[in-house]
């Protein structure tokens, strides 16, 4: 059954406000295309940050 029939909210009008959460310091690749080092530490730091919503 389609979402309209179940009265789901219209998700086309949802806009994300503010800056994106993705930060370069947590990215798996650098701007020049090389791979960042210490992936386990990056993933842990990204998961522990509190700058969301």
Swiss-Prot record:
Q: What is this protein called?
A: Small, acid-soluble spore protein K
Biological process (GO), any one: sporulation resulting in formation of a cellular spore
Q: Which domain of life is it from?
A: Bacteria
* Biological source species: Geobacillus kaustophilus (strain HTA426)
Q: Where in the cell is it found?
A: Spore core
Asked if the record carries the keyword Oxidoreductase, the reply is: no
- What family does the entry list? Belongs to the SspK family.
Q: What induces it?
A: Expressed only in the forespore compartment of sporulating cells.
Annotated region described as Disordered, given as residue ranges: 1-53
Question: Which Gene Ontology CC terms are recorded?
Answer: endospore-forming forespore
Q: Which UniProt keywords apply?
A: Sporulation
Ranges of Basic and acidic residues composition bias in the record: 16-32, 39-53
Indicate yes or no for the key word Zinc: no
Q: InterPro entries given for it?
A: SASP_SspK (IPR012611)
């Amino acid at each position: 059954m389609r979402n309209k029939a179940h009265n789901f909210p219209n998700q086309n009008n949802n806009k994300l406000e503010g800056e994106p959460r993705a930060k370069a310091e947590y990215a798996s690749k650098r701007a020049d295309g090389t791979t960042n080092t210490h992936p386990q530490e990056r993933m842990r730091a990204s998961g522990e940050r509190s700058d969301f919503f």
